[in-house]
Amino acid sequence: MSSTINSFDKNEIIMDRYEILAEIGSGGFATTYKAMDHSLDIPVAIKAFHKHTGASMDEAVKEAKIAAGLYELEGIASARDFFWYKETPCIIMDYVDGTSIKDYVREHGRIRGDKMLILIKPLLQSLIKIHEKGILHRDISA
């Protein structure tokens, strides 16, 4: 029986260009990996959709086009490429280095007041702009 969650192995080379470095995270729709783009010598993120989501070619292409159009929004990674690999729709996105809010809270404890506003405000402003474009984000995580 085949797995519904697609996974790439560390050091696996995708499309003769992208080397998988680590899994960044996994949500209900996809798993995201940090990878090295050996053509441009830059780190990128690869979003690989899970099979159980039933992501069709049209849906995956639509998400890639939406992500490509969000390059001007603070805190939002833009799409650089889209392809199918091992029957898996994949989006290559900007890699944004940093700590998740979840990990920050684990390490430093609860974030209070003004500090939380400073962290969240740019993301909420970008989310508002995304909604104004008619896009509903399905999987927001900390």
Predicted segments with their positions:
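Protein kinase catalytic-loop region centered on the HRD/HxD motif
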Residues: 124-135
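Protein kinase glycine-rich loop
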Residues: 21-27, 32
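Flexible N-lobe loop architecture of eukaryotic-like protein kinase catalytic domains
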Residues: 25, 62, 71-75
